[in-house]
From Swiss-Prot:
One of its GO terms (molecular function) is magnesium ion binding. GO terms for biological process: fructose 1,6-bisphosphate metabolic process; fructose 6-phosphate metabolic process; fructose metabolic process; gluconeogenesis; sucrose biosynthetic process. This is Fructose-1,6-bisphosphatase class 1. InterPro entries: FBPase_C_dom (IPR044015), FBPase_class-1 (IPR000146), FBPase_N (IPR033391), FBPtase (IPR028343).
Length: 338
């Protein structure tokens, strides 16, 4: 597939390489791209259409929702439930699964998404994004249950994100087909392939972590960051740079483009809240881990490969360390050493 091809043509070509593929998969990815285009327009207009600021509501995690959190969730529901390509939907912004109303046609797939990741940045005009994961729906199920969504990350058919920044970029990882980047050409409203078969450098001198939590970190994380901060004079023998955007989509996109490691590890503060991590497994950690692994990187909790975690709840949380493979493996080794 050549640079400059449209997302639609790429999907059609990719589907030919998938066993038991039908037009539903193409249709579903087209539905997602339509939703992302609409969200890109809302993000771009911001206060011009009254989209900035907080809504008078909280999501299931107890987090105050931004106006755009609510609106983008509605955009996804409208775009994804009209054409019969999915059987159900899970969103960060909804307590329970979204079941299609009768007599809607049910598709072969289930969608899990964070409609607007990093929304705390929206009021200050910092990049935000959409994250999505696609898994197969159980055969013969009229209305899927929450348990049907609880599949290992390795079972994802595809995953991706859309970054709303200076340009709008859709990154897609179809299982076994690598990672591709598509840039929205606003002149004619199409996502165009601009980078194909993206690979993350194995080594890096950049890390992204919220250092304000340093006093709460576990020893393996403390050791790793301490070594990085010692630079050339320390055991690593090289200087490192720190990055932190507080938007997972922006962090992962930077890593895909030039390498790095992103960390939101388990720490004492998170444990005190009775949580297993900060980021959501099913619609943040799993899809991003599939993307990173298909680009040659690694993704772990520090103790276990993320894609092999056994999920127990659609809003379950997990620690996340992902990015350049050699650094991720080093951090995992530090956890093993204790």
């Amino acid at each position: 597939m050549h640079i400059g091809t449209t997302l639609t043509n790429y999907i059609i070509e990719t589907q030919r390489n998938l066993p038991e593929a039908t037009g539903e998969f193409t249709g579903l990815l087209n539905d997602i791209s339509v939703a992302c285009k609409r969200i890109a327009d809302l993000v771009n207009k911001g206060d011009l259409v009254g989209m900035l600021g907080s809504a008078d509501s909280e999501n299931v995690q107890g987090e105050t929702q931004k106006k755009l959190d609510v609106v983008t969730n509605e955009v996804f529901i409208e775009a994804l439930t009209q054409n019969g390509h999915i059987a159900g939907l899970v969103s960060e912004e909804m307590d329970d699964i979204y079941t299609l109303p009768n007599p809607s046609q049910r598709g072969r797939y289930l969608l899990l998404c964070d409609p607007l990741d990093g929304s705390s940045n929206i009021d200050v005009n910092v990049s935000v994004g959409t994250i999505f994961s696609i898994v197969r729906a159980p055969q013969g199920s009229e209305n899927p249950s929450a348990g049907d969504f609880l599949q290992h990350g390795t079972e994802q058919v595809a995953a991706g994100y859309c970054l709303y920044g200076p340009s709008t970029i859709l990154v897609l990882a179809v299982k076994g087909q690598g990672v591709q980047m598509f840039t929205l050409n606003r002149d004619f409203g199409e996502f165009i392939l601009t980078r194909k078969d993206v690979q993350i450098p194995e080594d890096t001198q950049e890390f992204a972590i919220n250092v304000s939590n340093q006093r709460h970190w576990e020893e393996p994380v403390q050791r790793y960051i301490d070594e990085c901060l010692q630079g050339k004079e320390g055991p690593r023998g090289q200087d490192f740079n720190m990055r932190w955007v507080a938007s997972m989509v922006a962090e992962v996109h930077r890593i895909l483009c030039r390498g790095g490691v992103f960390m939101y590890p388990l720490d004492a503060k998170i444990k005190a809240k009775g949580q297993n991590g900060r980021l959501r497994l099913m619609y943040e950690a799993n899809p991003m881990s599939l993307i990173v692994e298909q680009a040659g990187g690694g993704a772990t909790t520090g103790r276990q490969r993320i894609l092999e975690l056994d999920p127990s709840d659609i809003h379950e949380r997990a620690p996340v360390v992902l990015g350049s493979r050699n650094e991720v493996e080093r951090i995992a080794r530090y956890h093993q050493e204790g």
